[in-house]
Amino acid sequence: MDARATELLATLRNGNVSVDVKTTSLAKLKSEIKQKHVPDAAISPLFESFRLAIASQHYSLSSAGFSALGHLLKRLTLQEQHEAIALQGRATYQLLLERLGDHKERIRSQAAQAFTDFWPAASADVEHHVLGAALIGKNARAKETSMVWLAKMTREYGLLFRIYVPALVTCLEDADGVVRDTAKSTVIELFQSAPPRAISDLKKQLIQNNVRKSIATSILSSLGANIVADSETSSSFQSQSRSDITRPATSFSHRREEVPRSQSVLSMRSHSNADVHNIPKIDAAFKSQSKPTRSGHSSKDPTLSHTASSESLPAPRQDTTDGEGVEPLYINSHREFDDTIREMLPHFEGKESEQNWILREKSIMTLRRLTKGNAPHDYQQYYLAGIKSVLDGILKTANSLRTTLSAAGCYLLQDIARTCGPAIDPMVEILLQSLIKLSAALKKITAQNGNVTVDVIIGNVSYTARILQHIWGACQDKNVQPRQFATGWIKTIIIRQGKHKGSIEHSGGLDLIEKCIKKGLGDPNPGVREGMRGTFWAFYSVWPERADVIMSALEPKSKNLLERDPNNTHRGVASQSFDGSRGSQPHSTKSSLKEAINAQKKARLAASSNVPSRPESAQSSFPDPKSGRPAPRRPTGTSTIRVPTGEKLSQSASLSSAPMRPASRPRRPELVRPATADPYSSRRSAAPTAQSKASSPSDSPQKSKSKLMTTPRSRNPLARPKSRMDNAANVTNDKQRADPAATLAPKMRRRGPSEPDVVSAAARARIAILSPSRTEGDFSVASSQVKIDQKAEEAFQGTPTRGIENGTPLPASPLRSPLKGAFSTPTRNRKSSDGAPPSRIPISPSYSSRRSSEEPMLPRTPLDSRRSRGESDEAASQIPAPVDQSPIIDAINSQSPGILKVYEDPQSPHSKHSIVLGDTVPKTPGSQAKVMPLEELPLNESTTVPNRKHNQLPEHTPLLQPSPILTPSSENSHRRWKKVEGSERRRSLSPRSKDPVKAQDMITRGLARIRTGALDVHGYRKFQNLIKYHESISKDDTKYEDILMALLEALEKPDGDKGAPSGRSLDLKTQVLVTIRLMLVINREAFAAFYPRVMTAIITARKQYELTNHIVSGLEETAEDIVSACNPPQVIDAILDLLETEERSFESYRMVAMGSYILSGLLRRLNNQKLYLSQAELERLGKFANENLRSTQPDVRRAIIDFCPELYDMVQSEDAFWSMVNSSVEDFRPLLTYYIMRRPEKIG
């Protein structure tokens, strides 16, 4: 071979030899190289010969040279002569670079392949020549070929391309169009599977090199990222309307107060303090006020998690607008955030000038976008440190004379306060000093922005005494604006800290608040006085005694204006209280007081004689007008309370010597708002009368307002252990309220040694039947006789009963036989008014399985524990104190001595008679049963329908383990949902609606309005009553399907009217959901066919609402019902079909998170039943998990992490599971392994 190599070299150098001869000689030697060993002496002549051939201008000879060179390099590689390859390559690279820029594509590709063949032996040299010379050279063809080569080497050999990204980005702006297109495709290919950090660096490179927007957008959209040019980050803010500036102070800081909610059932929060929209409730007075929103900035981002102190509360959020929305900016590392802060620091140095104010505005907008993004949550420590470093610049911006720049700074501070909450406590001092001074600015817009910012900060950070000291300083300011704004700030603190009065009282803040209120009520400016009046009544709701002292010290004119203030919802109580205090004055006598009382009595009696007729849909009878307002709360166990009427006390004014104007036309006392029509009726409670021996089970008669009554405070003797679904029982301090949406299956207490084993005859005497005049949601006064229907008797025959006190099994009555699949509803006991100890009642097997751990009979299912969250308003069952025997007892005792039977509501269309526990109230002339809004529910609902409110399940329902869809829910939101759902039961039906023919016509017309979206809230409620009353509707499969499909479409439909108040559309959607749940209850068999469709509608509807909306609890509850009863494979396919086709958006992550938790619950159910899915379904689930593990939303990632352990159990094969779920780009194996192994069953 040595001789043939030398001969070939001579042939190629001879110019007289034809090209064909040279090509033939080269081909022969190539064949020999492929088959034989190449000696060392022949290496140099061969390389020289091939270089001559490649350099030839003849295509055939050049192509043959490339081919022979490739075979030679492969042969030498097999012979492991890498040093010889590297040595000869140094003399070959320049020639290959020239050919890399050849105008023929074939030659360029062969040259690139030659570099590829050299790369294993001399990678550094090859990269230097191709990527360090050709890529940055001037030859466009060489650039194009080198980029293609880079993509190929990265794909096949794992070449690290990071250091060549700047050169690639430079090529994106090359003058040659082909180079630009190749560069774009190369960048997309290289970064297609790159980590987020690399994509972030690419964004910076694109911005630094000023790559045209079309190219950058195309690249980033292909990579799933986005970019916003710096020029677009600065935006001018819309000025606030003049009406917002000139409004009186009473319009500021009137926010509703609500209990902070915990986490949701299906959608867990990212942080413990996330997204609390409202503040805790203080008094029912604030519930009936309409509260105007304040101008400012709205935020929908969750707040920071933090360690809450005893004085701190979750950060509330206001529904305000700043004129323009801000697009969130997401970062991938804390270093990226630090770099951003470092770049904007120079812009805030020195004074504001024409050169730097635009840069400052851009920086503020960038900080707002970062605050809206993931920086405060994922990198909290670095975010707070960065904000602290630029805080001085932010305050400079807020105090700028440029209105736009000042507004931007204020909006940023509001965003920070809402997002971080108590985490910014160390900065509050300096912020309040600057912003209170800003609120005194001459520019109304600037002053208003300062006011709103101070209010937002106060409403979101932890309370300290220094905050009140700053407000006290504002109350003493010489400018009117800070004094006027201070009224709203004080009210915010009172409302927010109302449930935690100790933090204010123990720090001396109460004295400061009193000083502020006194100074405000006596301020020379009428606007300040008007604003402070509203603050005074908020103060009155929390500290009524201290407020009485302040009010008694006012002048008569000021006191009169204060009592007539619109914010005064305690007018009756306050007027009477102060009238009583005036009664001790010398000019007030007992005779005048008696005359006033007698005149009021006569007026009431005369008015009650001519009571106008009322429509049945409102209320069939009028309640006593004395129950119009609740009695005020007192801290002692028994309190003396004046019961007010709803009318204005014209005679009360005569008790004072002050001259009074003639009163306006008085309200008719008999037209008190009925309980069924009062939207706030569910929030009011009436204190039971202790002296009454026989009273209604829901309320007791009250004395006239002229007399004093003593109301003992009843306590809850038996507390149910908290489930993980609820964190606190919804029981007021005054009395226990019955939640109309849920009937508790209470934990029975142990029998004392002196208590009997059976219900005494006197206790059994307190049984009443439902009055025919009442609707199926209420109790009423009992008649004196009971007729027990034979059918109702047979329905309960043979049901095993337990001892009344000790819960031991008793022999079944021969007249009773078990009902298959039916569950009797547990009754409720109430504590008697005279304090008699409670007695037990018979309970069903399903009820006994949920008794306390001290009396175990059946194992409590995990599903039972998760069902208990709506039952926190109920106390342990008790029987009232005994009264005289009645014929009712004889009827009961004749059937089964020692056993208390409970039947269904006689007014219900599904039953004949009903016997319930209650007090017998003897009717006297001139008195009637009062219909109070908070009353007991009927004890027995349909026994053929499993009732989630009683923790009952069908016998065939498997026991489920706690599922991720049952994570702790928001107490406040769930309570509101329960109130909404339960309130739909307290409605009567008109005679026209009871006619089946007319009802069918109304159903048809209502269905048409549902489809067009024209049905209002009251229409939905009437529609629900029609469905509940007429069984024929639920039994007609066609009609049932039409109604259900229309309701599901209405539930999925997004809110189209953006200009309307959000509460109206939310109320409509709530009624739609209540109607769907009603369809589920009345016909579960027909509803079961639509489980997949209903589940997809629920997930689609979840997309439209924040986690804090109470409708979310209803959606989650409905999903739980379906999970426990459906065919899992069908529902899984429906959910995956929905989520796989859903377009990714900012709101769609809510659907994905909820769907993931539902899938987790379905898989858990299958795993517990030892049922497995097909391979195709498992692959779909694995693909779903793999795609969403890389989601940018923390809620989605958390849901998928909870979903993966259930999928792991379902797949069974560990290798198959990791091949489905794990990603080649990012290894999730350690994270998922941790969560799989930390489960209780694995640890145990």
Swiss-Prot record:
Instruction: Give the family from UniProt.
Output: Belongs to the CLASP family.
UniProt-recorded name of the protein: Protein STU1
GO terms (molecular function) for this protein are: microtubule binding
Write down the Pfam families for this protein, in alphabetical order. Answer: CLASP_N
What SUPFAM superfamilies would the database entry show?
ARM repeat
Which key words are in the record?
Cell cycle, Cell division, Cytoplasm, Cytoskeleton, Microtubule, Mitosis, Nucleus, Repeat
| S-S bridge residues | none
User: Could you tell me where the Polar residues compositional bias lies?
Assistant: 261-271, 287-312, 574-591, 607-622
Basic and acidic residues composition bias: which ranges? 863-872, 979-998
Origin organism of this chain?
Answer: Coccidioides immitis (strain RS)
The record's annotation in InterPro entries points to: ARM-like, ARM-type_fold, CLASP_N_dom, TOG
